[in-house]
């Protein structure tokens, strides 16, 4: 009796595991599509977000949504086939197509984040050049096209082969049978791009830290021969006193070193405090997205290195499954991170969707005049 009940128990456990896996994949798919589509609509509808950084973020969110829509249903289908024993994982053509799409979206995110890091550095370190040349939509369009072109060149032809029978990774990262180091080149290029992105942000951190050092003010004394103070250290008080009628003697000379601030193109100053805070918030948000990309793709890249360089069985199956699921989670986590790190996005979201506001916020936004109705 005990032996007869064991197969049924194992079958029930496998069915429960399959149901949990399909439910989790469905949840990831829905969260990714809902978050990325909502984020894209917010950027398109809000005019204050029509700037180059948010255009790049829009492209990143659309790519994540397409990746979730293309890859997660294939993983769900492979899981159902493996559980029902209805056939092997996808054939050679299907496996190469899935491998190409996975490599394309992965490299697109890596190259786009590298371009974003470079533009963030220019926005802080060379703000005048960035404001004149790179702040519009043409720069964002060029970066997006370059990211897609480089990703297409890196992912085509597919270098991944169907080497595993696991339903989580039906197209596992394997070395080619003829010994061509295709998968190894794929991994090395990805590591170089991600490492270069973090080096750019590290250089930006050093730049901000060097400019935060307090330097003592060097006071230049004003020149005075007849009580009319002028020169580099003059504050204009003597001229103001003379104009008000408190002075005697000749008219003081014009102050040196004061340039009139006009509305022209050359009148734009360096990075002021509010602009600096806005650029810093954008840098924090994009670096959080870049760091999460490294943390969620890092375990899978390490496992792939071990499978390519050592042997396919060198990686424990539990670690490989967990690393693959982390890459699935990366497709839907970017909108959450952006809303957490960017106050401007939260304000625009409340303005575009008033139904999501709390009652206290709504009452503060639309006050009611009780005296006007006699209360």
Swiss-Prot record:
Provide GO CC annotations from the record.
plasma membrane
Entry superkingdom: Eukaryota
> Where is the protein localized?
Cell membrane
Which SUPFAM superfamilies does this chain map to?
A: Family A G protein-coupled receptor-like
Membrane topology per the entry is: Multi-pass membrane protein
Which residues does the record list as glycosylated?
3
Q: In which tissues is it expressed?
A: Highly expressed as a 3.0 kb transcript in brain, ovary, testis, heart, prostate and peripheral Leukocytes. Lower levels in pancreas and small intestine. A 2.3 kb transcript was also found in peripheral Leukocytes. In brain regions, detected as a 3.0 kb transcript in all regions tested. Highest levels in the caudate nucleus, putamen, hippocampus and subthalamic nucleus. Lowest level in the cerebellum.
The record's GO molecular-function terms, alphabetically, read:
G protein-coupled receptor activity
What protein family does this chain belong to?
Belongs to the G-protein coupled receptor 1 family.
Report what the protein is called.
Answer: Probable G-protein coupled receptor 27
């Amino acid at each position: 009796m005990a032996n007869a009940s064991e197969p049924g128990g194992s079958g029930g456990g496998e069915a429960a595991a399959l149901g949990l896996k399909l439910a989790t994949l469905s949840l990831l798919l829905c969260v990714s599509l809902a978050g990325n589509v909502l984020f894209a609509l917010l950027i398109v509808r809000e005019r204050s977000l029509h700037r180059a950084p948010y255009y790049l973020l829009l492209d990143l969110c659309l790519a994540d949504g397409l990746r979730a829509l293309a890859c997660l249903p294939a993983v769900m289908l492979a899981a159902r086939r493996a559980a029902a024993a209805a056939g092997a994982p996808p054939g050679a053509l299907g496996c190469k197509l899935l491998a190409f799409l996975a490599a394309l979206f992965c490299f697109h995110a890596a190259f786009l984040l590298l371009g974003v890091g470079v533009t963030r550095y220019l926005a802080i370190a060379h703000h005048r050049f960035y404001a004149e040349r790179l702040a519009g939509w043409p720069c964002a369009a060029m970066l997006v096209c370059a990211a897609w072109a480089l990703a297409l060149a890196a992912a085509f032809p597919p270098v991944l082969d169907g080497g595993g029978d696991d339903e989580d990774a039906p197209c596992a990262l394997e070395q080619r049978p003829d010994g061509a180091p295709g998968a190894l080149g794929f991994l090395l290029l990805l590591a170089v791009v991600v490492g270069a992105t973090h080096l750019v942000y590290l250089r930006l951190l050093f730049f901000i830290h060097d400019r935060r050092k307090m330097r003592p003010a060097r006071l230049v004394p004003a020149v005075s021969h007849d009580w009319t103070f002028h020169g580099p250290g003059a504050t204009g008080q003597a001229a103001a006193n003379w104009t008000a009628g408190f002075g005697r003697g000749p008219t003081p000379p014009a102050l040196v070193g004061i340039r009139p601030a006009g509305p022209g193109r050359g009148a734009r100053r360096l990075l002021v405090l509010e602009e600096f805070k806005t650029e810093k918030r954008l840098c924090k948000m994009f670096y959080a997205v870049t760091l999460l990309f490294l943390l969620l793709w890092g375990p899978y890249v390490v496992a792939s290195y071990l499978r390519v360089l050592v042997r396919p069985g060198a990686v424990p199956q539990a670690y490989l499954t967990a690393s693959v699921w982390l890459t699935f989670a990366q497709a839907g986590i970017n909108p959450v991170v952006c809303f957490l790190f960017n106050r401007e996005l939260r304000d625009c979201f409340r303005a575009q969707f008033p139904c999501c506001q709390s009652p206290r916020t709504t009452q503060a936004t639309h006050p009611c005049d009780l005296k006007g109705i006699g209360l």
